[in-house]
Amino acid sequence: VLLIDLDPQSNATRGSGIDSASLKSSVNDVLLDRASIKETIVLSEHDGYDLLPATPALTESEVSLVSKNDREFILKNILKAISSDYDYILMD
């Protein structure tokens, strides 16, 4: 199971016990093509799910993506790289 935190308040990230300040990259970086999804996913050994974390910087991608063509397909195309790795992908 993969949980994708798409909220700039990072509630799913914080609720998973992850300090967003300690992250090298987040879903924002993936959406803006500054990091790969595979290197950004935080693997869980105990909780039964992996996490694509968010930070407050996610508001940056909201502003940047609004003017992009085919923006509604960006996340879909990103998920192609990992879709076979997970039975379920949940988005918050």
Regions found by a protein language model. Give the residues of each.
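P-loop NTP-binding core
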Residues: V1-M91
